[in-house]
Amino acid sequence: MQKATYYDSSAIYGAYPYQGANGFTYNASQQQYPPSSSLVETEYHRPACSLQSPGSAVSHHKANDISESCMRTLPSQPLQPPGLTDPQAPPQPPPAPQAQPPPPSSASPSQNASSNPAPANSTKSPALNSPTVSKQIFPWMKESRQNTKQKNSSSSSGESCAGDKSPPGQTSSKRARTAYTSAQLVELEKEFHFNRYLCRPRRVEMANLLNLTERQIKIWFQNRRMKYKKDQKGKGMMTSSGGQSPSRSPVPPAAGGYLNSMHSLVNSVPYEPQSPPPFNKPHQNTYGIPASYTAPLNNCPPPQKRYTGTAAVTPEYDTHPLQGNGYGNPHIQGSPVYVGGNYVETMTNSGPSIFGLTHLSHPPSANMDYSGAGPMGNNHHHGPCDPHPTYTDLTAHHPSQGRIQEAPKLTHL
């Protein structure tokens, strides 16, 4: 069936400009293409991609914008309509030496009118619309036309075949969801309780027992392991967040003795829980030693707090009641430091930097979280009550008293 009766004279026969009655003129420097006498105004050769009647001027512009394949083979044409960028259209064969005679005028207006409301199809197969062109072009267009028909028919038939085959094939497809019975689920859960990973003989045995395939059992165990891992992760987060709050889990009494033996401090005194717990903030890195203990301060003034050391060197300081040799970095906020068995949360307000002997007094509101359970001696607080304030650390060896000779090296923070 012929879809259209016009072909692009400016595309294939670019040397012959024409002027239509609707006001569209292709201006070229060569002689004008002589129109056929039988076709007066409606039978000028239109572009192959434009299927419009002569009266549709706006759609004719759109067809000129769409059909790049009509203009692609003429790089030396003087005037091309702008915006012809269709990269998907194949190039035309070389132009014929003379124009083909147009079809009879009786069939062309009706076919033109029938093909008028379909300009979108012209972008897919621009050369399908001209059945009356030279033999160099016609087989290619016929082939492409048949190819599109074959593609459409094959895709529809493929869909129908896939639709026919998919219901029986869903049992073996990956996307199929296997419905397990309650008895099968009980057996699978029981097996998972004892063995999270099945060996192949046991898997074959269970497949025969439960009337399932090995693949189904393997995939069920994979999914069940992932679910188990997710559940364990959720439980671990819940217990860790709940167990680290100081009000929930008290420290067992053996923890004090263990830390005492680990520290081997000289003048250790028994601890008692303080009545007002200082800065009892639940932190997630306190490693399950959440209850706070303080040493008896022996009637010392409250601003003079004890500070614990962090490194392997533990010098003892001279009597300087509020000497600012703090072992807490004031710039690292909220990260607890493991110091001498105690988990001390570093200060969040301004203070002297690490090991800076700046002689600045620590403010009494420094957020020191004494959440460790290790006992410390009564000589481990400085102030006017004790002439030599001692700074304890993890290794707990005490060098001779005197002023500090060098700044201790910070090994882990």
UniProtKB/Swiss-Prot annotation:
Its main location: nucleus. It is found in: Nucleus. Residues 72-131, 143-177, 230-252, 374-413 are annotated as: Disordered. This is Homeobox protein Hox-A3. GO terms for molecular function: DNA-binding transcription factor activity, RNA polymerase II-specific; RNA polymerase II cis-regulatory region sequence-specific DNA binding. GO terms for cellular component: nucleus. Sequence-specific transcription factor which is part of a developmental regulatory system that provides cells with specific positional identities on the anterior-posterior axis. The lineage of its organism: Eukaryota, Metazoa, Chordata, Craniata, Vertebrata. Residues 88-106 have a biased composition (Pro residues). The keyword RNA-binding does not apply. A motif (Antp-type hexapeptide) lies at residues 137-142. It comes from the Eukaryota. One of its GO terms (biological process) is embryonic skeletal system morphogenesis. Disulfide bonds: none annotated. Residues 107-122 have a biased composition (Low complexity). Residues 168-177, 238-248 have a biased composition (Polar residues). The gene is HOXA3. Residues 173-232 bind DNA. Gene3D superfamilies: Homeodomain-like. Keywords: Developmental protein, DNA-binding, Homeobox, Nucleus, Transcription, Transcription regulation. Belongs to the Antp homeobox family. SUPFAM superfamilies: Homeodomain-like. InterPro entries: DUF4074, HD, HD_metazoa, Homeobox_Antennapedia_CS, Homeobox_CS, Homeodomain-like_sf.
